[in-house]
Amino acid sequence: MIKNIIKIGMFGVLALTAASCQDTMDTHPTTTFDEATVWGSKATANAFVNATYDNVINMFTGSSSCVGWESRTPNGVRCSQVGEGIDGIATELGIDRTSDFGISRFGLLRRCNMIIEKAQASTALSEGEKAEIVAKGRFLRGLVFYDLTRKMGRFVPITSVIQADQEEKARVPMTSSVDESYKLVVEDLEAAIPNMPVEAKPGEPTKYAAELLLSRACLQAYAYTKKAEYLDKVITYASDVTQNCSLSDNYGGLFNETDETNAEILWGYYRLKANTKIGNYEELIRTYPNISQDDCINSKSPIHFKNPNGRTYEGWAIYFPTQDLVDQYLVTDEKTGEALPWNETSQYKENVESIDPNTVTTEGQLDAYEQENGNARRMPTPQDFQQLNTAYPTNLHYGKLKAGSTRNISELMYSGRDARFASSIVYDGCSWIGETVETNLGGNCSMGVR
């Protein structure tokens, strides 16, 4: 009897051990999920979508290239006289057969197409969930198409998941024209909008983010095709955004941790402070100047830095806003209350005498001085701004205070601007990171201060 008990007990232990080994060893990779799991619920499908969002949003913010592309628009300019030199992409002198502006994004397009196809075929998702996931896939694919179009004009439009053995299916020709490219961009983004969520968690795009990006794409499409239908779409979709999304009372907080979930943020880009540095982002490190207290002293600036070490600005700026962008911030006329360009207000005209740029022909004609070390500094002349492409006229304004005026010319230019101007643009007399900024000749942040 005892032997039987022992045998049965031993067999029980062996059976338990075998079962334990089977459960323990029959595992799956911990870093991947099978398709049934991914497309088996809205939560797991959204996890796949969110990972794809991270790859796509970098085309527009947070990457080393996005700010460079923005500097090739009327909004920004890249200006570096040190290591980087002239932008070889903008001049086309730096483009050759190895230049890659996204031609090989087939892996990313495959992810977008998988989102669309797998969601449509899922038997676990509800019809409403399917529609939303598919919309997100169309949104993402439309943005990839948009980035390819704005950089290259034509691209290979992969719109389905292609398997390794489907060689014929992979023979997809490039779009025939910029017109066809933008047609595909707009089709995807328009198809996405009706089923995109109206509200989303921070970091996820909403219907209004899709409408905003579609409006932007349509403006560029019109610039190339001149088709009025694109302007109609801009009005329709941009109006829906402005009518349903409120503006923030804390505009400056939109860009930092003080108001990180503001309702005006339609698609936020978030990173943890613990493992994120200013130096990781071109939008930050390449927009801050590199100026020391010694530079201010040598430049004879009347305003020195408050920072006891004199190192408030330790970036390496090469990207700057254009005059075209700055001029879009209108100034309130002190007499009429009308919003006008800065040089058309009554206060400016009454106090400033405009100088015809054609009369400025000599170096130092308007203003010049020597720094402590003997380096000459002067106001630029039109000859300093000559360019080879006459299609882009230089935006120059010269002026001086009229005799007897007690106003400050910088104050006349910048006071009363659009309320968001001060949070977007660094200008003469403003406060930036706790320091008073001078951009006038010889000022602590002026051209040539170093």
Which residues fall in each region the model found?
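Membrane-proximal, proline-rich intrinsically disordered regions
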Residues: 21-67, 254-255, 359, 396-398, ...
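Bacterial Sec-dependent N-terminal signal peptides
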Residues: 1-30
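Short coil/turn linking the two alpha-helices of tandem helical-hairpin repeats
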Residues: 149-151, 156, 200, 220-226
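C-terminal substrate/ligand-recognition segments
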Residues: 398-450
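Conserved, well-structured interaction surfaces
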Residues: 41-60, 79-152, 172-202, 389, ...
